[in-house]
């Protein structure tokens, strides 16, 4: 154990994600690294939001790996890519349909490893590919500059399953997707607006209807 003095903490330098526009308005000044968890009910815009976020990281020059474990590269996912405006001549995001924790660790150990890893979903990663929450957290601590973005199903208002709950507790950024808005729920203050709109028309109809109830 190494104890830090106040001076040590004052001298520490941090690297931040240079978000602009809607992403900055939603999520503010986020430190690079750690676990992000994106959770919400089906049909609310989780997949589209994570693709928008992956596209934004790619635009900023981060190398991105997207593990579409749940949907695979099916026609629906192809449609989501098109809707998000992700195209081969513009974007360089890499996609995989299968990923074990051993695969991920091997990938991260390489010299040109991804800066950001998206895993859809935490339930598929733990149930189908036998990843453990403790191992995910260990990887987060080992690769501190890497960003891990997990999507999660919900049970009521909470993430579904013990593994997802443990990963959420360790997460630096929590984003609840409801009514086509990705709403910042992290530990510290988010952006001025506090949410990112995934689909303007759908969000407008959903929130007007809910406000009138």
Question: Where does each model-flagged region fall?
Answer:
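Pre-Walker A adenine-sensing motif
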Residues: 14-30
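Charged, amphipathic alpha-helical linker segments immediately N-terminal to NTP-binding catalytic cores
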Residues: 1-13
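Short acidic, S/G/P-rich loop/turn micro-motifs used as interaction or catalytic elements
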Residues: 44, 72-73, 122-129, 155-158
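Conserved P-loop
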Residues: 32-103
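Phosphate-binding/switch region of NTP-binding enzymes
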Residues: 142-213
